[in-house]
Amino acid sequence: MSSTKKDIKVYVNYRDEYAEPKIISALKNSGKELTFTNSAKEANFQWAQYEDIDFDEVYKNPKTKLCCSYVIRKALIRKEYLWRTVITYLAKHPDSILSKSVPEAYSLELDYAEFLDDSLMEAYELRQELEENATKNISEKQWYILKPSMCDRAQGIRLFSTIEELQAIFDSFDDEESESEEAGLEEKGDITVAFNNKIVISQIRNFLVQKYISKPLLLDHRKFHIRAYVLATGALSVYLFNEMLCLLARDKYKKPTPDPDLLFSHLSNTCLQGDNVEQSSIRDFWNTSIENKDDIFKSILNIIGDVFEAAATTQGIHFQPLENCFEIFGVDFLVDCESQVYLLEVNSYPDFKQTGKNLSNIIENLFSAVVETAIIPFFESSTKRNVDSKLTLAKKLQLFGFR
């Protein structure tokens, strides 16, 4: 599994002015003899953006070359794939913690707003619930949250409770596409995103509709989610980083409405708050006033263990961990007023700079833990794997080939 060479050629190209210096510092403090190179092909170890990794070299050299990302993992990071992963796993493991910790969801597929009715015919249970909502008082309605499958940073997320409200959301997205030559648009990989947080339907196609958790736990009257960092190594050990963040919505919490102007009280993605995020919006989980923190941490640990096992054992085409790869995932959780923990989503290449300056030591500690646990052991002659004290094992599996 290891290289006998003392000198390790390292290729770092993270293209993030917040994270990359911390990555390099963690590597230099590893105690290993390193030579930094500009060639991914020549490197023994690649810590770079996904599109900059030479995966051919990773495949050809499973014992001597390591990289910071799995090649295939959409069973976890695509929203509708994650939902399928969970329901497939629960069919065989109905007693899993995932049965109560993943909000019920429905998948919609459409190219244009005019095809919503056809898509709802497939999701007939959702359609029935939305029709029932139309006859209820606003206080009695079940609310839903619409999430474009391939978008991140909260792009395109909306709240709704009826078919009419959902149709209006998709109509507004279609309007954005027709006005794209006049409006300012930004390219996000293969996805075009408007600066007003709208998206172009035809470039997305797949959407996930989740039941909205209507009674979230609040901090200072503001909704928040927990950002946990997860390290997956080889095939397959999964660790939860002990230091977690609470990311707070900009505005005080209000009851759900379809008004997009009130989204800032419901969406706790701090990236929506611009470059000058208030430090009060980003907090160290362990230093908050949240009760039952140990129980919440344990629930998160168990959820992570089961969801990675679900992907690894039921989605062999869409999650293929390799022994000479590791990856850091940003996993988001919501806690309700009864301390029930819900899994929201799994993110590849999480936006570390959301942590900000005041809590940057958390990211520094994370990278140090990754170096100690995922990188140094790979290049050591000993088969013993060191595990940093800031990591807690969530799941260990032995996977060989396709499942």
Swiss-Prot record:
Its EC number is 6.3.2.25. It catalyses: C-terminal L-alpha-aminoacyl-L-glutamyl-L-glutamyl-[tubulin] + L-tyrosine + ATP = C-terminal L-alpha-aminoacyl-L-glutamyl-L-glutamyl-L-tyrosyl-[tubulin] + ADP + phosphate + H(+). Pfam families: TTL. It is found in: Cytoplasm; Nucleus. Its main location: cytoplasm. SUPFAM superfamilies: Glutathione synthetase ATP-binding domain-like. The keyword Magnesium applies. GO terms for biological process: protein modification process. Keywords: Cytoplasm, Ligase, Magnesium, Nucleus, Potassium. GO terms for cellular component: cytosol; nucleus; P-body. It comes from the Eukaryota. Belongs to the tubulin--tyrosine ligase family. This is Probable tubulin--tyrosine ligase C12B10.04.
